[in-house]
Amino acid sequence: MTTVYYDQDVKTDALQGKKIAVVGYGSQGHAHAQNLKDNGYDVVIGIRPGRSFDKAKEDGFDVFPVAEAVKQADVIMVLLPDEIQGDVYKNEIEPNLEKHNALAFAHGFNIHFGVIQPPADVDVFLVAPKGPGHLVRRTFVEGSAVPSLFGIQQGASGQARNIALSYAKGIGATRAGVIETTFKEETETDLFGEQAVLCGGVSKLIQSGFETLVEAGYQPELAYFEVLHEMKLIVDLMYEGGMENVRYSISNTAEFGDYVSGPRVITPDVKENMKAVLTDIQNGNFSNRFIEDNKNGFKEFYKLREEQHGHQIEKVGRELREMMPFIKSKSIEK
């Protein structure tokens, strides 16, 4: 049964008197740090020199190299990209951990797959907002919040649970609700959602729809409008009220087509393929492939990225977006 915690459920402020080091000052890092600071906590930033280092200073934080930030902290929240966490942990975090420090993450990848293996005498917890950093920050300022997940991997001090919930409250998450989970569940469901649906599944569905229309002789511009541009209209309806809201809002023709043609596209074989994707996540095949490719300079990753960048749908999209000044268009430089 799902357990959800709110402000009133966090009885003890286990962060009181503790120094928090936020390692990283990107999307999640700036939101966590600023929300904690606004709630009165002692926050320092650990980061390497660069734009984010300068931005954190501009925002009024004490900023240090990662090792120095960790040395002075009781709670260390690691908010770096998955692929660099392992090296930063090994070289800058682990040598400076002390007994009963708390090591925290917003995604469980490196803990769950064993890239990072903390010593047994530190707490390890997860607080994972279910939204991007700018939304975590904006909703906090507005007095609301983004729902979040939390979980405990190890509790050496006996206070890991209280610290995790206090941290979740500190970034504002308990205003909306914090769902209890595990590193395993958070990691595997997050990766599956990205690969099978949100990123991999949707991108290939759109691309295949575009190719089907163009190969049948239809204008690429019309194909783009029908399978990519209008996707936002449907996703917004889904976001606001689920599939029922989509079906309530679209025409009867579209709804009928949903029922009779959807199962022809997403067949039982597709679900079996999804299960295979999930299995590769669960057994470590995907993580091993990602980790090894990272060690080899991301040769496979960059090759795949370049292949997708050259697809016709991207060229058509760039041209059509110039006709729509109401869209805040983004061109990704290569």
Swiss-Prot record:
Record keyword Ribosomal protein present: no
Pathway(s) of this molecule: Amino-acid biosynthesis; L-isoleucine biosynthesis; L-isoleucine from 2-oxobutanoate: step 2/4; Amino-acid biosynthesis; L-valine biosynthesis; L-valine from pyruvate: step 2/4
Residues reported to bind Mg(2+) 1: 190, 194
PROSITE patterns per UniProt: KARI_C, KARI_N
Domain of life of the native organism: Bacteria
Active-site residue numbers: 107
Cystine bridges: none
Cofactor note: Binds 2 magnesium ions per subunit.
Annotated TM spans: none
Binding site for substrate: 251
Cofactor(s) named in the record: Mg(2+)
One Gene Ontology molecular-function label: magnesium ion binding
InterPro entries: 6-PGluconate_DH-like_C_sf (IPR008927), KARI (IPR013023), KARI_C (IPR000506), KARI_N (IPR013116), KARI_prok (IPR014359), NAD(P)-bd_dom_sf (IPR036291)
GO BP terms: isoleucine biosynthetic process; L-valine biosynthetic process
EC number annotated for this UniProt entry: 1.1.1.86
Keywords, alphabetical: Amino-acid biosynthesis, Branched-chain amino acid biosynthesis, Magnesium, Metal-binding, NADP, Oxidoreductase
Residues at which NADP(+) binds: 25-28, 48, 52, 82-85, 133
Ranges of residues in domain KARI C-terminal knotted: 182-327
Catalytic activity: (2R)-2,3-dihydroxy-3-methylbutanoate + NADP(+) = (2S)-2-acetolactate + NADPH + H(+); (2R,3R)-2,3-dihydroxy-3-methylpentanoate + NADP(+) = (S)-2-ethyl-2-hydroxy-3-oxobutanoate + NADPH + H(+)
Binding residue positions for Mg(2+) 2: 190, 226, 230
Family: Belongs to the ketol-acid reductoisomerase family.
Alphabetical list of HAMAP family matching this protein: IlvC (MF_00435)
NCBIfam families: ilvC (TIGR00465), PRK05479.1 (NF004017), PRK13403.1 (NF009940)
Function: Involved in the biosynthesis of branched-chain amino acids (BCAA). Catalyzes an alkyl-migration followed by a ketol-acid reduction of (S)-2-acetolactate (S2AL) to yield (R)-2,3-dihydroxy-isovalerate. In the isomerase reaction, S2AL is rearranged via a Mg-dependent methyl migration to produce 3-hydroxy-3-methyl-2-ketobutyrate (HMKB). In the reductase reaction, this 2-ketoacid undergoes a metal-dependent reduction by NADPH to yield (R)-2,3-dihydroxy-isovalerate.
Protein name: Ketol-acid reductoisomerase (NADP(+))
Organism: Staphylococcus aureus (strain NCTC 8325 / PS 47)
GN (gene name): ilvC
